C-alpha cells in the first residue's frame, strides 16, 4: 500500500510540474510547436491558391500560417530563416474571394497585422516581421499551421 501511495504521489508531482507547459499536446514528426499550434516550413514554391490547398492536405485543420502576435511571427521567422534564408513565404492573409477586407484562410480573427498596400495576397519576409502585398500567382515558399 505504501508503494502505491509513493508511485501515485510521483505521478501527481510530474503532472503538476507539466501543467501550464506545452507538454499537454504533441505535434507530428517534422512539425514545430508554439502556443498550442503546430507549424511546418516547406521548401516547395507555389502560388497562393495552391499553397493553401497544399496546407489543407498536410494535416486536418491545417492552413497557411496566420499570425496573432509579434512573438508568433518571431517564432516562425526562427524556423524559416535557417531553411530558406532571405526570401518570402505565403501567409494565410488574402482577399482572393474579392471581398472588401482581407481575412485569414483558417477563419481566425484578423487581430494582428504588419503590412501595407495593394495586392490580394500577403507574404512575410523570412528575416523579420515585415509583410508585403504580392500577386497571388507568384510562386513562394509555404508555412502551414494547425491547432494542436
From Swiss-Prot:
Compartments reported by the entry: Secreted
Principal subcellular localization: secreted
SS bond list: 27-38, 55-144, 121-136
Domain C-type lectin: 34-145
PROSITE patterns: C_TYPE_LECTIN_1, C_TYPE_LECTIN_2
Matching InterPro entries: C-type_lectin-like, C-type_lectin-like/link_sf, C-type_lectin/snaclec_domain, C-type_lectin_CS, CTDL_fold
Free-text tissue specificity from the UniProt record: Expressed by the venom gland.
Keywords: Disulfide bond, Hemostasis impairing toxin, Platelet aggregation inhibiting toxin, Secreted, Signal, Toxin
DNA repair in keyword set: no
GO cellular component: extracellular region
This protein's record includes keyword Secreted: yes
Entries under Pfam families matching the protein: Lectin_C
Function summary: Strong platelet aggregation inhibitor. Binds specifically to platelet glycoprotein Ibalpha (GP1BA) with high affinity and inhibits vWF-dependent platelet aggregation. Has also been observed to induce small agglutinates in washed platelets by binding to GPIb.
Miscellaneous comment text of the record: Negative results: has no effect on ADP- and collagen-induced platelet aggregation in platelet rich plasma.
Family: Belongs to the snaclec family.
PANTHER family: MANNOSE, PHOSPHOLIPASE, LECTIN RECEPTOR RELATED
Assembly and interaction partners: Tetramer of heterodimers of alpha and beta subunits (alphabeta)(4); disulfide-linked.
Name of the protein: Snaclec flavocetin-A subunit beta
Amino acid at each position: 500500500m505504501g508503494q502505491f501511495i509513493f508511485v501515485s504521489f510521483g505521478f501527481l508531482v510530474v503532472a503538476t510540474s507539466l501543467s501550464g507547459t506545452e507538454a499537454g499536446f504533441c505535434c507530428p514528426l517534422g512539425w514545430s510547436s508554439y502556443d498550442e499550434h503546430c507549424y511546418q516550413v516547406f521548401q516547395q514554391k507555389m502560388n497562393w491558391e495552391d499553397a493553401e490547398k497544399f496546407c489543407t492536405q498536410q494535416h486536418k485543420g491545417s492552413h497557411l500560417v496566420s499570425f496573432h502576435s509579434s512573438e508568433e511571427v518571431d517564432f516562425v521567422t526562427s524556423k524559416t530563416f535557417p531553411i530558406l534564408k532571405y526570401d518570402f513565404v505565403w501567409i494565410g492573409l488574402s482577399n482572393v474571394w474579392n471581398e472588401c477586407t482581407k481575412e485569414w484562410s483558417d477563419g481566425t480573427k484578423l487581430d494582428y497585422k504588419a503590412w501595407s498596400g495593394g495586392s490580394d495576397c500577403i507574404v512575410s519576409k523570412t528575416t523579420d516581421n515585415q509583410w508585403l502585398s504580392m500577386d497571388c500567382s507568384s510562386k513562394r515558399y509555404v508555412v502551414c499551421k494547425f491547432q494542436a
